[in-house]
């Protein structure tokens, strides 16, 4: 007794009404699922590629446009930061934070001092984290605790500056300077 094979499955981009595949219910469900997948893929691609056509710089050559087609306007990646650059950046930002005392406490420019504090702290955070990752695993817990206490103090100082509380700002400033003085000999 010979077993008859079902017709081979074939997938087309468009749904063919005359196809012998769609005669059974299971094949019909398969056809609907694949057409939904195709639709979703096409919508996804068109949603990302069509806006690119409107944002091309027409002054560039067509080969440059083709090379940048999948760039999606992302900035070029930064070159890899080294530990030496991170240490230099950490020292520079620490000096900026130490100068904030003049802005906040002596001149009472709370808003400007807070902006400078947040900018320097943001840059310092990235550099300090890179330095911690470069340290041997046995030294990292100490640096992580210094990292945590430093940036908690910076955050508290920022909130005290927003409230205009000079005594709290001075207290947190002294704490920050002490932590920074503890960090630099260990690096």
Swiss-Prot record:
It comes from Arabidopsis thaliana (Mouse-ear cress). It comes from the Eukaryota. This is PsbQ-like protein 3, chloroplastic. The keyword Membrane applies. Required for both formation and activity of the chloroplast NAD(P)H dehydrogenase (NDH) complex. PANTHER family: OXYGEN-EVOLVING ENHANCER PROTEIN 3-1, CHLOROPLASTIC (PTHR33399), PSBQ-LIKE PROTEIN 3, CHLOROPLASTIC (PTHR33399:SF6). GO terms for cellular component: chloroplast thylakoid lumen; chloroplast thylakoid membrane; extrinsic component of membrane; photosystem II oxygen evolving complex. Disulfide bonds: none annotated. Disruption phenotype: Impaired chloroplastic NAD(P)H dehydrogenase (NDH) activity, probably due to a reduced stability of the NDH complex. Its main location: plastid. Subunit of the lumenal protuberance of the NDH complex. Belongs to the PsbQ family. It is a peripheral membrane protein. Residues 1-32, 33-60 form a transit peptide. GO terms for biological process: photosynthetic electron transport chain; response to cold. The keyword Membrane applies. It is found in: Plastid, Chloroplast thylakoid membrane. It holds the Pfam family PsbQ. GO terms for molecular function: calcium ion binding; electron transporter, transferring electrons within the cyclic electron transport pathway of photosynthesis activity. Keywords: Chloroplast, Membrane, Plastid, Thylakoid, Transit peptide. SUPFAM superfamilies: Oxygen-evolving enhancer protein 3.
